[in-house]
Amino acid sequence: MSKEFSRTQRVSQQLQKELAVMLQREVRDSRIGMVTISDVEVSRDLAYAKVFVTFFCVGDQTPESSLAALKEHEPSLRMMLGKRIRLRLTPEIRFTYDNTLVEGMRMSNLVTDVVNTDKRKMAESGRTESDEGEE
């Protein structure tokens, strides 16, 4: 009988929940700012966890500086995880900046720019969108 979710998926979901709570309540570092854990990928042997994070940067904070500050807390977060989650081996945590949101916004802006350029060119030539379909 197959399981609905594999063990690695269940462990990654649990790690995501626990890390989110720990970052919110236990890590007191103003350099990190507001952090969101978007995904966790756990290796098949559960030895490594790649944690994808995004930041809401305020003032002079950058994602790079926030990520560097967060990486300083990797050993202590791993130790706290070991106390909260009972696994034979607590995964080594590796934080990675998740730029999918930024890339998605960039792609959306590119599409919007192209659509606006097409509309402007059509207006300059005196054609309408319904004329395009008739040709």
Swiss-Prot record:
GO terms for molecular function: ribosomal small subunit binding. It is found in: Cytoplasm. InterPro entries: KH_dom-like_a/b (IPR015946), RbfA (IPR000238), RbfA_dom_sf (IPR023799), Ribosome-bd_factorA_CS (IPR020053). GO terms for biological process: maturation of SSU-rRNA. Keywords: Cytoplasm, Ribosome biogenesis. It holds the Pfam family RBFA. It comes from the Bacteria. GO terms for cellular component: cytosol. Monomer. Binds 30S ribosomal subunits, but not 50S ribosomal subunits or 70S ribosomes. Belongs to the RbfA family. One of several proteins that assist in the late maturation steps of the functional core of the 30S ribosomal subunit. Associates with free 30S ribosomal subunits (but not with 30S subunits that are part of 70S ribosomes or polysomes). Required for efficient processing of 16S rRNA. May interact with the 5'-terminal helix region of 16S rRNA. This is Ribosome-binding factor A. It comes from Aliivibrio fischeri (strain MJ11) (Vibrio fischeri). The lineage of its organism: Bacteria, Pseudomonadati, Pseudomonadota, Gammaproteobacteria, Vibrionales. The gene is rbfA.
